[in-house]
């Protein structure tokens, strides 16, 4: 209901996260949730907020996100992160892995799938994507979907650490940051100069409109009610 109201009110974007081991945040697939809103929203851009890349095979992510972009007629923002919930990592068997390394390999593999033509042969440390043994391209077998937006939906990356080097690297790759909602304001503001640094490195403008900041907001009829819930 909140997403539908935001669409009616003219909000520009809305994001939804995912966790598989959190009763308080019980949306287990942000892509599935966004897909459920495709036909009911008209103008708002919808974002995965975020796909936790170490928890899914890159081929599955690439295929789902490509289809979702078509379902939304190009209104998708592709939000990604390494995932911050330890119990999610444990349930997927990645708790002791270098999840930042998995994150980078995951998004690089997704982008290679979208950039490549079948048959695929993409091999990394954690995943391998290939259709070389079974590809029959003349009948469409072994060909993966590509997103509607070219070269791909806008990529948005979570920023958690103060003075995040990841923000700089993301900006240099053409991606946009979204500062996490649990950061204190003095740490959130450190992300902007790091974003500017990354943009300047590749000669792209650093537009404040592309810097997203997540905050927890509680709306009530009066302040007393809000404080009671808090």
Region annotations inferred by a language model:
Residues 50-55:
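The substrate-binding groove and active-site-proximal loops of carbohydrate-active enzymes
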Residues 6, 10, 18, 37, ...:
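Conserved, mostly hydrophobic/aromatic
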Residues 165-171, 206-212, 219-230:
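Aromatic-lined glycan-binding groove of carbohydrate-active enzymes
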Residues 1-48, 151-153:
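N-terminal beta1-alpha1-beta2 module of alpha/beta enzyme domains
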């Amino acid at each position: 209901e909140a997403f539908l109201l935001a669409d009616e009110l003219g909000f520009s974007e809305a994001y939804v996260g995912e966790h598989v081991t959190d009763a308080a945040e019980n949306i287990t697939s942000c892509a599935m949730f966004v897909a459920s809103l495709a036909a009911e929203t008209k103008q708002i851009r919808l974002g995965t907020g975020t796909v936790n890349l170490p928890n899914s095979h890159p081929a599955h992510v690439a295929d789902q996100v490509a289809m979702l972009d078509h379902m939304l007629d190009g209104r998708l923002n592709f939000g990604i992160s390494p995932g911050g919930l330890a119990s999610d990592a444990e349930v997927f068997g990645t708790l002791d892995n270098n999840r930042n390394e998995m994150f980078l390999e995951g998004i690089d593999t997704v982008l290679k799938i979208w950039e490549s033509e079948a048959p695929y042969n993409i091999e990394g440390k954690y995943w391998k994507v290939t259709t070389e043994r079974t590809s029959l391209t003349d009948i469409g077998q072994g060909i993966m979907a590509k997103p509607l937006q070219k070269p791909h939906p806008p990529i948005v990356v979570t920023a958690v650490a103060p003075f995040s080097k990841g923000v700089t690297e993301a900006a240099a790759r053409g991606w946009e940051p979204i500062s996490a909602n649990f950061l204190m304001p003095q740490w959130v503001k450190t992300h902007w100069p790091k974003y500017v640094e990354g943009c300047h490195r590749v000669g792209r403008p650093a537009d404040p409109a592309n810097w997203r900041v997540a905050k927890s907001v509680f709306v009530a009829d009066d302040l007393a009610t809000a404080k009671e819930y808090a």
